[in-house]
Amino acid sequence: LRDKSLVQTVPGPGHEPRFRLMDSVRQHAAEQLAASGDEPTAAGRLLSWMLQRLAELDGRFPQMPMMAWLACLRPDVDNLRAAFRVALADPSRAVQAVDLFARSPNFWVRAGFKHDGLLWAQAVPPLAAGPLPGDLRARLDLALAVLGTIGWVLPPAQGLAAAERAALLEKTRQRIDS
C-alpha cells in the first residue's frame, strides 16, 4: 500500500514504523464505513481503545521520562481528538467523555496542544453534572487543576478551585474508607 501511495510511514514510539492513510484514502474509507452502517461500532471501538491507551500511559506518567511519554501518545493525537468527538456526540457516552478528559490534560499541556485542552475543558465538565462512578469526579477536578495551574489553559483561580475540590473529595473518600 505504501508503494501505491495509499499509506505513508511515520515514526512511532521506539522508532518502529506506524502507517497513516493518505487523506483522500481516509475520506473514502470513512464514507464506505458510514455507508456500511458499521460506523457506530467502529467509533465505539476507537473510544474504548483510546481510553485503554490513556489509562496505560497515565499510569506510567510519573515514572517515564517526559519526552518518551509524549512520544508514546503524540502519534495518536488525531485518534484522541476523534475519540473526543465520538464521546461528545453521544449523550450515553458522557462518562467516557469525562474519563477521556480526566486522563489527557498532561498530554495537551506538555505536548503544546493547549487549544485542544481548552476545547475539551469547555465541552466536557457540563457532562459531569450528574453522579460519576468511583474517583472520576476527583480525576476530572485534577484534570481541570492541571489545565489551570500548570498549563495556563484555564484561569489559575479556576484551576486552584478544581484542585481544592479534588482534595476535599479525597479527604472525604479517606474518611469513608477508614
Residue locations for each model-derived region?
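Alpha-helical solenoid repeat scaffolds, predominantly canonical TPR units
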Residues: 79, 100, 120, 162, ...
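C-terminal ligand-sensing/allosteric alpha-helical core of TetR-family HTH transcriptional regulators
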Residues: 28, 45-49, 53, 79-82, ...
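Short coil/linker segments at helix-helix boundaries
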Residues: 56, 60, 64, 154-165
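Amphipathic alpha-helical dimerization/coiled-coil segments
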Residues: 37-71
